Amino acid sequence: MIETDKLATEQRIIAATPASSHEEVFERALRPRQLDDYVGQEKVRGQLEIFIEAAKRRSEPLDHVLLFGPPGLGKTTLAHIIAREMGVNLRQTSGPVLERAGDLAALLTNLEANDVLFIDEIHRLSPVVEEILYPALEDYQIDIMIGEGPAARSVKLDLQPFTLVGATTRAGMLTNPLRDRFGIVARLEFYDADQLSRIVRRSASLLNAQIDPNGALEIAKRSRGTPRIANRLLRRVRDFAEVKADGQITAAVADAALAMLDVDPVGFDLMDRKLLEAILYKFDGGPVGIDNLAAAIGEERDTIEDVLEPYLIQQGFLQRTPRGRVATLLTYRHFGLSVPDARRPERDEWDTPDGK
């Protein structure tokens, strides 16, 4: 039972991580190529415009950049845009791939002047690789060992000036020495429905899909604030529209397609509803401990904490308390339930005694 649910969770259509290598290829085709085409993240985009222009005027590499935030918000896209705006090459890798110091040294020594090195999941770098990275970031030099045993000696190699762009969904897992070496740190936030609607319309035009503004907005509202999910839903709605609606994506067509996919009006799927319904119906709205909740829905604790809960908490449908998980007023309303009187004081704990 648990294995089946794990498989279902990994294949969720509203998952923020790429579903397959095929989807990654599809994403690359839809990526904006310039900052002017990048939708949303206005603060980050404005900062990068200034920093990139200043670096180009001085003919210097851009300061090292750390991009962090939930998956699917455009960190990889921004890394590609940074390289393109700087007019340099981009080399891409990920933290888990760099297992040995030699792996990183090979990448660094092949960089040309002012190139961008993009390391995804940078929080997963091994300590050995991190140690090599520190002098490379500060002094554009690396120390490598030549030979073995008593004959081994350290050789210092000079590197071309370069920019490291690191991306992570877990900035708290970065070591302080590594974090301190980034001159530019930017957090990517969830998108609102209007921004996602613009992304959906742009992607639809690239896919030659016919979509009206209301159809784009309907997809956007169910995309959980994440462009990757919006583009995935657009592909599935396009399939539905071509078979059932002469290819035209309207609000009604999008609603019918997403209902078929079990994605409700706020972007919840079966797994989200299963978790919330368990709290409401099996545990009277909570509080319930994470282990009891995991047993009740046949999921692993890590899956609940890392995959299911973050969006529910961010949207205000779930609370973590010292006593366990608790359903909020929004959850009761979403399922059309009246709120038990015993629950009201917990939800209104900041109100004054007279209710004002």
UniProtKB/Swiss-Prot annotation:
It catalyses: ATP + H2O = ADP + phosphate + H(+). Homohexamer. Forms an RuvA(8)-RuvB(12)-Holliday junction (HJ) complex. HJ DNA is sandwiched between 2 RuvA tetramers; dsDNA enters through RuvA and exits via RuvB. An RuvB hexamer assembles on each DNA strand where it exits the tetramer. Each RuvB hexamer is contacted by two RuvA subunits (via domain III) on 2 adjacent RuvB subunits; this complex drives branch migration. In the full resolvosome a probable DNA-RuvA(4)-RuvB(12)-RuvC(2) complex forms which resolves the HJ. Has 3 domains, the large (RuvB-L) and small ATPase (RuvB-S) domains and the C-terminal head (RuvB-H) domain. The head domain binds DNA, while the ATPase domains jointly bind ATP, ADP or are empty depending on the state of the subunit in the translocation cycle. During a single DNA translocation step the structure of each domain remains the same, but their relative positions change. GO terms for molecular function: ATP binding; ATP hydrolysis activity; four-way junction DNA binding; four-way junction helicase activity. NCBIfam families: PRK00080.1, ruvB. GO terms for cellular component: cytoplasm; Holliday junction resolvase complex. Pfam families: AAA_lid_4, RuvB_C, RuvB_N. This is Holliday junction branch migration complex subunit RuvB. InterPro entries: AAA+_ATPase (IPR003593), AAA_lid_4 (IPR041445), DNA_helicase_Holl-junc_RuvB (IPR004605), P-loop_NTPase (IPR027417), RuvB-like_N (IPR008824), RuvB_C (IPR008823), WH-like_DNA-bd_sf (IPR036388), WH_DNA-bd_sf (IPR036390).
